[in-house]
Amino acid sequence: MGDIRLAPRFVMGFLVAATLVGLVACASDRDPPPAEPSFYNSLASAEAKVDAGMAASMISGYRTNNGLSSVQVDPELTKLAQAQAQAMAARDKIEHNVLRDFNVRMRSSGFDAKLAAENIGAGYHTLAQAFSGWRDSPPHRKNMLLPGATHIGIATAYAPQSKYKVFWALILAAPDRPRG
């Protein structure tokens, strides 16, 4: 009779152990947590690159919430923004005319714009920080909400020797003629 009493306890113990092993196995099979959104990625390194598509999406959302058109990334504007960001980083200066006047740069860019505006900045280490800084600054907000803008170029440049580390340039524009 003593053996019969041990059997249910043994079976119960075995079932509890098997259940625990199964739960542990299930827990380890879970998908890894999702990656952090790219707008939180630090751009304070030489190999980091701003996610232009994410920037266009954020700016488009902001614009459409304010009754304006969305924007798309343009390669010519991106090249122009990259040159501006790199020039500011090389000189450790935050200014629109570090290369040449913005209007002169636009005319020589290959992007025939009927309207354009430029936001620059430094010290923001993520796209989220730059976007928030521009949104909270009246002149920069006005540029992000430029009526008629349909294209953007955005770029960063890393300057490890600078107190700012990351320099930004954002260009919003509308082409004079539809772009293909």
What residues fall within each predicted segment?
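Bacterial N-terminal signal peptides that target proteins for export
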Residues: 2-14
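A short alpha-helix/helix-coil micro-patch that ends at or immediately precedes a cysteine
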Residues: 34-89
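Solvent-exposed, polar/charged alpha-helical surfaces in well-ordered, non-transmembrane soluble domains
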Residues: 53-61, 75-86, 104, 118, ...
